[in-house]
Regions:
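Ser/Thr/Gly/Pro-rich low-complexity, disordered linker/stalk segments of secreted
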Residues: 22-69, 377
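Extracellular glycan-binding segments that recognize GlcNAc-based cell-wall polysaccharides
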Residues: 52-408, 419-422
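Compact, charge-rich alpha-helical regulatory domains located at protein termini
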Residues: 406-434
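Sec-dependent N-terminal signal peptides of Gram-positive bacterial secreted proteins and lipoproteins
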Residues: 1-22
């Protein structure tokens, strides 16, 4: 059908165009009366044409509304030359006036997750090396008016040398170190900084993914995230749970491979509550399940890598600040569960992606924008000129083609290249042509 239509369009373009005005013009020897009548007729014709044109515009707008208007999606991306720079760029945008900052070793993802218990969207997370601050982080700190700097982890994570330099360079800032004997103890220590909490969230301490997208749920429920091991709850975790007077809701984020049934039973026995588990078949579907629980009709979503933790972890404090869910994506593939969620959730009009092209490719990013805009990515794309020609061949053109009307699509220049496909059919991967 598509090839036939394209061929017919090319054939039409080879025919000479007949001007209706030339065909209907009066003979040179016509009388003045005929000319006057012709002028009156022309005026009426112009008025009718204008009215018809206005009606067609209104009708087209109504039709477009019925079929689904393409939304003007607000989209932005935060990235940097390295993970430290990405974190700084996020801080400058969302936490420009902060007076507190949390420093995390750039290779210690468990400490970064624990940092969210203290941040809760109020303070930024910046990266440091074990023995020295990066140039990017040092420059960012120099521009802030800080009264407190948190260090996540012990001296084996952020050395005493770094701490001493911070005390020297920022004499008016209080330096507070949050640490434990291991990642689970550090998690429990960070949870102690939360007050009036009646909800608890548990996630695996052996991978960053589940705990990362759980941060938006933690902000929604005003709950700390406690990292756990499948070997059982640590003593510090048990003590923290027992220190809470009244517990309302208890949630495990992640499947049984991440947090097994035995640990779930321990949590239920300690909290005296039935535990809710949020999980999907993989981390991508799990992030969708959590997103649905955070907000059924979100205005904004955050996407970040489900494969590389460095850039992704910076998104946690942003998600808490703007109350937006985090969706995990692959580098150059938009997983089916995430794609369907974006397509079906009509409330979304803003997309924030955190991470560079090495973690989320340009094609993947543009696919997300297109899906959120409301475009049916399974159909070929027509420009406005192509629409007029297609209508001559089929009245049901909207069943087969998409007619974009916003800034994301360039007009098609040649009719023999009328059909531009946005789908690159590789398993679950949809990538628009650049």
């Amino acid at each position: 059908m598509k090839k036939l239509v394209a061929l017919m369009l090319v054939c039409m373009l080879s025919f000479p165009v007949v001007s209706i005005a030339d065909k209907d013009s009066p003979n040179e020897g016509a009388s003045e009366k005929v000319e006057a009548n012709a002028n009156d007729t022309a005026k009426k014709s112009d008025a009718n044409a204008k009215a018809k044109d206005e009606n067609e515009k209104k009708q087209e707008q109504i039709t477009t509304n019925e079929d689904g208007v393409f939304k003007n999606v607000i989209h932005q991306r935060f990235q940097g030359e390295n993970r430290a720079k990405t974190a700084v760029n996020v801080q400058r945008h969302y936490f420009a006036n902060t007076n507190k900052v949390i420093l995390v070793n750039d290779n210690a993802y468990p400490d970064a997750i624990s940092a969210t218990n203290m941040s809760m969207g109020k303070y930024p997370l910046l990266y440091t090396g074990k023995n020295s601050l990066s140039v990017e982080t040092k420059s960012a700190l120099d521009k802030m008016f800080l009264d407190e700097i948190y260090l996540m982890g012990g001296v084996n994570t952020i050395s005493k040398n770094v701490e001493n330099k911070l005390r020297k360079n920022f004499p008016h800032a209080k330096i507070t170190r949050i640490m434990g004997n291991n990642r689970y103890d550090t998690s429990a220590e960070s949870a102690k900084t939360r007050s009036n909490t009646t909800n608890l969230i548990f996630a695996a301490g052996t991978n960053y993914a589940d705990a990362l997208y759980a941060t938006s749920l933690a902000a929604h429920q005003n709950a700390p995230i406690l990292l756990v091991s499948n070997e059982g709850l640590s003593q510090s975790t048990r003590k923290f749970i027992q220190s809470i007077g009244n517990i309302d809701n208890v949630t495990i984020v992640g499947g049984e491979i991440s947090v097994n049934q035995s640990v779930k039973n321990q949590i239920e026995n300690l909290t005296k509550k039935r535990v809710t588990r949020l999980a999907g078949v993989d981390r991508y579907e799990s992030s969708v399940e959590v997103a649905k629980r955070v907000n059924a009709n979100p205005a904004e979503v955050i996407t970040t890598s489900g494969e590389v933790f460095a850039d992704a972890l910076v998104s946690s404090t942003v998600a808490q600040k703007i109350k937006a869910p985090i969706l995990l994506v692959k580098k150059d593939v938009l997983p089916l569960s995430v794609r369907e969620y974006m397509k079906d959730t009509n409330s979304i009009y803003k997309l924030t992606t955190i991470g560079g092209y090495n973690t989320v490719t340009k094609n993947n990013y543009s696919t997300q924008v297109i899906l959120i805009s409301g475009l049916d990515i399974d159909k070929p794309l027509l420009d406005k000129q192509g629409k007029g020609l297609i209508k001559a061949f089929t009245k049901d053109y909207k069943k087969y083609y998409v007619l974009p009307n916003n800034k994301y699509y360039n007009s098609i220049k040649e009719y023999d290249k009328l059909f531009v496909y946005l789908r690159d059919a590789l398993a679950e991967d949809y990538r628009p042509l650049e």
